[in-house]
């Protein structure tokens, strides 16, 4: 007689800001500028096992607002939005997509709010980050890893 298959368990234990920094290197003069800044976003995800079935996933965004004509940084915000997730009874080959796609999709709205709120509190108009397709980023990373090192395990860190 076969044992009944246990149902997968996915629980969000905690969502939190792990790290947050804001730099306004040319304050207060930068507040007198009339030029609209160019916004650059760098995005990365990472994960690690805390213990057993408990995982930490971190989505990091670095937003830089630069005055193009003067090549001057208005502000730079870096936020690490993290979550602790309990994941149990998920097959080994399915855990990476959960950590690389599902968890970042849960964390991203919190990250977007953190960035927007921080920029607004710094005295600038809010920066609203566009939605991110973490599944496409994950698949691209998997394809790149398969091409570059076909026999090596895939690094689950994604950069965008």
UniProtKB/Swiss-Prot annotation:
An MF annotation (GO) of this entry: unfolded protein binding
GO cellular component: cytoplasm
Database matches in SUPFAM superfamilies: SecB-like (SSF54611)
Single GO BP term: protein tetramerization
Keywords for the protein's UniProt record, in alphabetical order: Chaperone, Cytoplasm, Protein transport, Translocation, Transport
Primary location group: cytoplasm
Subcellular location(s) of the protein: Cytoplasm
PANTHER family assigned: PROTEIN-EXPORT PROTEIN SECB (PTHR36918:SF1), PTHR36918
Job of this protein: One of the proteins required for the normal export of preproteins out of the cell cytoplasm. It is a molecular chaperone that binds to a subset of precursor proteins, maintaining them in a translocation-competent state. It also specifically binds to its receptor SecA.
Assembly description: Homotetramer, a dimer of dimers. One homotetramer interacts with 1 SecA dimer.
HAMAP family: SecB (MF_00821)
Family assignment from sequence similarity: Belongs to the SecB family.
Protein name as annotated: Protein-export protein SecB
């Amino acid at each position: 007689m076969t044992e009944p298959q246990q149902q997968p368990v996915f629980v969000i234990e905690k969502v939190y800001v792990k790290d947050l920094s804001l730099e306004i290197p040319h304050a207060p003069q930068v507040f007198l500028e009339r030029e609209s800044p160019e916004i650059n976003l760098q995005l990365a995800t990472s994960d690690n096992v805390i213990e057993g079935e408990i995982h930490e996933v971190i989505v990091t965004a670095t937003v830089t607002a630069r005055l193009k004509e003067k090549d001057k940084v208005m502000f730079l915000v870096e936020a690490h939005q993290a979550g602790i997730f309990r994941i149990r009874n998920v097959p080994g080959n399915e855990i990476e997509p959960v950590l690389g796609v599902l968890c970042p999709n849960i964390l991203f709205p919190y990250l977007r709010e953190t960035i927007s709120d921080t920029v607004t509190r710094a005295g600038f108009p809010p920066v609203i980050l566009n939605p991110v397709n973490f599944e496409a980023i994950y698949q691209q990373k998997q394809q790149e890893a398969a091409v570059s090192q076909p026999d090596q395990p895939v690094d689950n860190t994604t950069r965008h």
